[in-house]
Amino acid sequence: MKLILDFFPILLFFGAYKLADIYTATGVLMAATVLQMGIIYAMERKLQAMQKATLVLILLFGTLTLVLHDDRFIKWKPTVLYGAMAIALAVALWALKKNFLKMLLGSQLQLPDRIWGRLNVAWIGYCLFMAAINGYVAAYFTTEAWVNFKLWGYVFPIVFLVAQGLYISPHLKNDEPSV
C-alpha cells in the first residue's frame, strides 16, 4: 500500500502528460500530491518535514507553471528540492555539528556515529547528484524527455537505498542475545 501511495502522484503525472500535456499533468500532480499527503496524514496523524517541503514546492512550482504557462518551473522543482536538502544536511553536519539522519532515524536504526556520519555525507552527495542530473535534463532536453526521465529516474533512489542498506547492515547493533 505504501509503495503505491509513494508512486501515485508521479504515475498520474506521467499518464496525464501522455494523454494531454505538461500543464494538465502539472495540475494532476498538484491534486494527486495533496490527496497523497491527506491520506498519509489521515493514516499517520503527521507529515514528515520532507513531505511538507515536497508538498509546498509542488504547489508553488506547479502554480507558477500553470499561471505563467511556463513548464520550466515544474521541471526545476526537483533540482531546488534536492539542492535544498543537500544544503540543509551539509550545514547541519558541518556548521551545526548535527546529524539530521541520525536525528530522524536514530530511534529506528542503531548505528555507530561514524556510520551515521558517512551516511549523512552519502546523502549530501546523492542529493547533489540528483539536483545536478535533473537540472541538466531540464535545461538541455525536451519536456517529453524530462517527463520520461522523471518516471524512469526513480531507479536512482532505489539503487541508492539498496546500496545504503547493504552498507549499513553489517554495522547494525543487535540488542537481542544470540541463540
Swiss-Prot record:
- The source's superkingdom equals Bacteria
Q: How does it sit in the membrane?
A: Multi-pass membrane protein
Give the UniProt subcellular location, in the record's own words.
Cell inner membrane
Membrane spanning stretches? 24-44, 49-69, 76-96, 121-141, 151-171
Is Manganese given among the entry's keywords? no
Keywords of the record: Cell inner membrane, Cell membrane, Membrane, Transmembrane, Transmembrane helix
Matching entries from InterPro entries are given as: YciB
Does Transmembrane appear among the keywords?
yes
Q: Mainly resides where? A: membrane
Q: Where is it found, in Gene Ontology cellular component terms? A: plasma membrane
Q: What does the protein in this record do?
A: Plays a role in cell envelope biogenesis, maintenance of cell envelope integrity and membrane homeostasis.
- Tell me which family the UniProt entry assigns to this protein: Belongs to the YciB family.
This protein is called Inner membrane-spanning protein YciB
What gene is it encoded by? yciB
